[in-house]
Each structure stands twice: as C-alpha cells, then as structure tokens.
C-alpha cells in the first residue's frame, strides 16, 4: 500500500478542497488516462484496488502509471475514548484530489482494452471520472462515466 516513508509532521489539518487541479491535469506518460470530475480524498486502499483491477484485466501487456500519491495522514481516536487529550493517531493516508486531476495513465494496449480496464478501475473510486486519450489518438476527451 502507498504511504510516505517519513513525514515532517505526523498530524495535519484537514484543509479545504476548492478550485480545480492546476498541476497533473494532462497526460504525461501514457496514451490513455482517468481524469477526476469531482473532488475527494482518495485513500491508499482505493488507489490499490483500482490498480489491481486494471492490472488484472490487461494481464501482461501495457504499462500503468499511478499519478497520485497519498501523502496526507488522517487521524482517528479509538472507539470508547472520551473527547480531549490531544489529536488521535494517524489511521490511514489519503491523496487530495481536485477536479481535472489525472489519476492513472496507461500505454501499450489497444484503446478498447484500455477503456475497459479503466472502466473497471472507475468502479473502485469514490468520485465521477472520465476516460481521456491523447489528441493524436483521435478524440481528446471521452464521455463522462457515472462512477
């Protein structure tokens, strides 16, 4: 599972997710990708589940790039503990996703295989996403999927 090796601060504020993604909103490595249409916290487990779904479908062909990294710790206090006495221990790690962010990229497979693999991965994610392709492969942006 993805998580940082070491961090400067163990606990961080929740922050706000406003605006669009200014970085990471274009395809850089692959020919096809999944682009976020909404904002969310994407957990390390969700990223891994989507990666496994794509990898198992394309079998040995093609490359997959994960373009997001969960670098934000989310803390949680144990059940049955009274309020106060500081912030809880880090429970899991999330990546902050804004609209327009490319989550995964893929290359080395035909478009129909990439589209189906990305569709399987989209079902593992908590936000609406869309399939995108490079300009030289015909269409620029695919249609929006429900999940």
UniProtKB/Swiss-Prot annotation:
PANTHER family: 50S/60S RIBOSOMAL PROTEIN L16, LARGE RIBOSOMAL SUBUNIT PROTEIN UL16M. InterPro entries: Ribosomal_uL16, Ribosomal_uL16_bact-type, Ribosomal_uL16_CS, Ribosomal_uL16_dom, Ribosomal_uL16_sf. Part of the 50S ribosomal subunit. It comes from Finegoldia magna (strain ATCC 29328 / DSM 20472 / WAL 2508) (Peptostreptococcus magnus). The lineage of its organism: Bacteria, Bacillati, Bacillota, Tissierellia, Tissierellales. One of its GO terms (biological process) is translation. Pfam families: Ribosomal_L16. GO terms for molecular function: rRNA binding; structural constituent of ribosome; tRNA binding. Binds 23S rRNA and is also seen to make contacts with the A and possibly P site tRNAs. NCBIfam families: rplP_bact. HAMAP family: Ribosomal_uL16. This is Large ribosomal subunit protein uL16. Keywords: Ribonucleoprotein, Ribosomal protein, RNA-binding, rRNA-binding, tRNA-binding. GO terms for cellular component: cytosolic large ribosomal subunit.
